[in-house]
Amino acid sequence: MKISVSSYSFYQYVRAGKLTLVELPKLAHDIGFDAIEFIDIPGETQEEKLALAAQIKAEADALGMEINAYTIGACLYQETDEASDKEVARLVQQLDVAVALGAKVMRHDVVYALGKTGAARSFDGMLPTIAKNAQRVADEAAKRGITTCTENHGYISQDSDRVERLFNAVNRDNFGILVDIGNFVCVDEDNVTAVSRLAPYAVHVHAKDFIFKSGKEVKPCGLSMQMIPFTRS
């Protein structure tokens, strides 16, 4: 097992111009991490993304730092075959970015939100399309020696029951689960039970915690908004 850090942890510094993505492997190395994970390499074109990924990999290689995962956004539920083809093609390009980084794992989302009509109204309605498109991405990933995965993330596919059903529906040897230890509490699920359920399918792990509150804490608010009845006289 290797302990890594995500580039997302330094997002505010990168956004403020205090760090560049190319500098992150050294920072992670100096802090003491074994590896680093990158999120959505930016670029106006695929060529720019590949060039930046190659720069990052060269810096990591010089330090003996592994880039152990590449994490991207995606929506694998689409209303039409044409839209599905377009999104799958975009993810295949992202697989090439993962190759340029030297990452052996690529995590992608599966859906962002429920819709108001048709199959998009429920997770089960969307699942066949999501699974089919995830299979297509996984099959392309296999040609590149990459394992794809999805995360318990984004509310729609976050509880362990849905994530396990998605895993079974995709049914590819190089498709697994990125288990985020903390995210289950966001859908009112016991973390220990959920992690135990998905552990056999895990190919990558995010260690996260939350401060869980009862909802009964006293918090300041505007006058007359809560407990104290203010009236004009």
Kindly label every feature range from the protein language model.
Residues 1-34, 51, 57, 61, ...:
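Histidine-acidic metal/acid-base catalytic patches
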Residues 7, 31-40, 69-74:
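Short, conserved active-site loops that position catalytic residues or coordinate cofactors/metal ions
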Residues 35-60, 110-122, 215:
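Glycine-rich, proline-tolerant flexible connector loops at the mouths of alpha/beta enzymes
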Residues 9-11, 40-42, 73-76, 110-114, ...:
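Active-site-proximal loop/turn and secondary-structure-junction residues that shape catalytic pockets
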Residues 37, 69-71, 107, 149, ...:
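Conserved beta-strand positions in the central sheet of alpha/beta enzyme cores
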Residues 42, 74-84, 223-224:
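The substrate-binding groove and active-site-proximal loops of carbohydrate-active enzymes
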Residues 58-66, 77-177, 186-188, 197:
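Active-site acidic/histidine proton-transfer and metal-coordination neighborhood
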Residues 12-16, 45-47, 79:
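A generic structural signal for short coil/turn motifs at secondary-structure boundaries
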